Amino acid sequence: MEVYVLFDNTWYDNSIIGIYSLDGYKTYRENLFAKAVEKLNFIVNDILNRKNAQEILAKEKIHEAEKLLPLEKEAKFNKDTEKFKQLNKKRKILLKEANKIKYNYPSTILHKHQSILEAGKDAIIDWYMDYNNIFADIQTIIE
């Protein structure tokens, strides 16, 4: 069986493979493909987890702001303008914080870049298929 020195420069690995037989090359590529898809899935899941955590935090801030509303109305009814202004300001700050948290980068990345992530998966699949085709061509030449 013939062997070849193969070099690899992948988007996440930057490594020299070494010497492999054609069968070893194919197995390596299959493993590399699986690792690439696994890494992409990890990134998507990480983004989803961050998004969920941020949504929970934003809901807590909104809930805190809603708790202040009856106190604010009571202060307005009692014509306690100083207390009303403080509560109103605090409530608005909480709502702004909730809005910032809710629409922060990690929570919107999945929505904005969903097509990029899907294209990434497609690119990995295409890349894998190209290498399988190269493998088939090399095998044909040798035979």
Language-model segments: residues:
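Short aromatic-glycine-(Arg/Gly/Cys) micro-motifs in beta-strand/loop hairpins
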Residues: M1-I16
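A short, exposed loop/beta-hairpin motif centered on an aromatic-Gly-Thr core
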Residues: D13-Y28
